[in-house]
Amino acid sequence: SASIPAPYRERGQMAYQTGKRIVDMVWEDLKPSDIMIREAFENAIVVNSAIGGSTNAPIHLNAIARHLGIELSNQDWQNIGYELPLLVNLQPAGEYLGEDFHKAGGVPAVISELLKNNLLPNPNVNTVNGLSISENCKEVIIKNPDVIKTVNYPIKNKAGFINLSGNLFESAIMKTCVITKNFQDQFLSNPNDLNAIEG
């Protein structure tokens, strides 16, 4: 898991296993383009939305997809990820630290919860270890429900990204899980308000 804190011994073990696997992939002729297919990017959108991931993710993943000849846009982030619940209570919007997230099960636990609720759109896509994402994560459990919530008791119901467009820009992404009630009331509720944000 990418959430392993740097000082942990597991981090070094993971780095070693990663290097070993890369060599095996060369011998197997398993290339990044075999793994990074449209369906894998759709899964990434879902997981990023459920963990309250960075607004940098759409920029970078869209660019990586485009480099591979896959069309992925900000509108895809809204279409695929907006309806997703926020499951991770992590700073800066939440209470807990990255180390707590790792101890609670990390990304594999979030994926497992999404799988149990049929929210991961493409559970059978292949991963770098030769197993599907479902095979890798389906048995992982949430070890701390204060840090990683269940779909039935999320932090927020609709927490993905929305794609904005208007006369100032063609496309901009907004992370809805960090929108507070106060911000929504002040800037997003009354279109006649002079301070309202209009898209």
PLM-predicted stretches and their roles:
Residues S1-G199:
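Catalytic or ion-coupling anion/metal-binding cores of large enzyme and transporter domains
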